[in-house]
Amino acid sequence: LSQPDESVDLIYCDILYGTGRNFGDYQDLKPIRSEIENHYLPRLIEMKRVLKQNGSIYLQMDTRINHWMRILMDDVFGYENFRNEIAWWYKRWSNISFGFQKMHDVILFYSKDKSKFNIQYQDYSKPNEIEDTVRGIIDGKLVRLKNDDGSFKKRETENKGVPLHDVWEMQHLQPTAKERVGYQTQKPKALIERIIKASSNEGDTVADYYLGSGTTAV
């Protein structure tokens, strides 16, 4: 890398998954620990160098190498700077002959020191929606029953939903999706957008050092 020290606010990388396959656009690493470590360790050290003190890094992978990557990330960024292991859950059936269907990717979220974080919200689940209906809604604001006479009382704040948890349900891109650009392992724009909104602000510098289909730049 030729970037100055501490010049990046957020790093997101959809890294090599260690499948050993040739995808045409690139040759993936083999799922061998020494090969994974030799490839990633020097790159992680450089990523830490360019990341600002309040910066964040997200690395996306699947279950083939996430256990090795967690060890490397702890070594480079520090166990105390681990923030979340996010599961991107999708429905994609395969012809697996043994074990449970594999339907999630792993996204490791670390900070360099004290990272910025913008809480993201999601809509209430159906049970909560039913409860909200019982409480009542007036002029778009959530209200609840008074204890004394049963009349409705407005709440002071708008209903934002609930804070986003660490299991993200989001479908893979379909072959006919409009945002498809012909890259086999392309990730949904909405997935990367969620990460950018959570850990960066307007005008921040976001880096993707495994820029496959270019989705991060969109």
Residue ranges and their predicted role:
Residues L1-V218:
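Core catalytic lobe of class I
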